Amino acid sequence: MAKLYFYYSTMNAGKSTTLLQSSYNYQERDMNTLVYTAAIDDRFGVGKVTSRIGISQEAQLFHKESDLFVEIAQHLQQQPLHCILVDEAQFLTKTQVYQLSEVVDKLKIPVLCYGLRTDFQAELFEGSKYLLAWADQLEELKTICYCGRKANFVLRLNDKGEVVRDGAQIQIGGNDSYLSVCRLHYKEKIAL
C-alpha cells in the first residue's frame, strides 16, 4: 500500500544521502523512481540532489507553481513509476503537499519526502508543516550538536560566524551558513 512519508531533521543529518540510497535501492531492482528537488536550491548545481558525502543524482525541479500531481501523472504515461522522492521538501507549498497526497491516494505510488522541520527561528516551513500534518508516516533523522546531544535546531551564522536572529526564512547557503544544535545551545545562542 502506497504511503506519504516525511523524513525530517535539522541540517547535516543525511537526508539527501538517505534519499539517494532509497532511489538506488529501487533502481537496483529495476524499478523506476522520479526524484524532485527545489528549484531555489542550487548549491550543488541546478536539477541535482547531492549529498555531502559526494554522491548525486539528476532530479526534476519543483517551483512554487509546479503541479506535482499533473507532472507525475504525465511521467507515469511514459513509464511505470515505483517511487517518488522529494528532496528539500520544506520548500513545498501546502497545495503541493496535497498534490503529493493525491499521488499516493489516486496513483498508488509511494512518495518519500525529505526536508528540514524548522528554520533558524524555530518556525515550521510551509512544506514541513503540512507534511507533519498529512504524512502517513513520519521519521526523524538524527544528528548531533557539538556537545554530543541530539541536535534538533539550526542556527544561521553570518560570514563572521555570528548568530543571526532575524531575516528571511529562506536563504540558500552551504553548511558554513548554518549550525545544527541541541535545544539548550539554541536557547543560549538565540537568548530567547
Curated annotation (Swiss-Prot):
Q: PROSITE patterns annotated for this entry?
A: TK_CELLULAR_TYPE (PS00603)
What top-level branch of life does the organism fall under?
Bacteria
What keywords does the record list, in alphabetical order?
ATP-binding, Cytoplasm, DNA synthesis, Kinase, Metal-binding, Nucleotide-binding, Transferase, Zinc
Q: Which annotated residues bind ATP?
A: 9-16, 87-90
Q: Where in the cell is it found?
A: Cytoplasm
Provide any one GO MF term from the record.
thymidine kinase activity
The GO biological-process annotations, alphabetized, read as: DNA biosynthetic process; thymidine metabolic process
Q: What is its EC number?
A: 2.7.1.21
Which Pfam families would you find in this protein's record? Answer: TK (PF00265)
**One term under GO cellular component:** cytosol
SUPFAM superfamilies with a match to the protein in the record: Glucocorticoid receptor-like (DNA-binding domain), P-loop containing nucleoside triphosphate hydrolases
Q: Quickly give the catalysed reaction.
A: thymidine + ATP = dTMP + ADP + H(+)
Q: Which positions are annotated as binding Zn(2+)?
A: 145, 147, 182, 185
Give the enzyme's main class according to its UniProt record, as a single word.
transferase
Q: Which family does it belong to?
A: Belongs to the thymidine kinase family.
Which HAMAP family does the record cross-reference, listed alphabetically?
Thymidine_kinase
Kindly provide the name given to this protein in its UniProt entry: Thymidine kinase
Which species is the source of this protein? Pasteurella multocida (strain Pm70)
Q: Which gene encodes it?
A: tdk
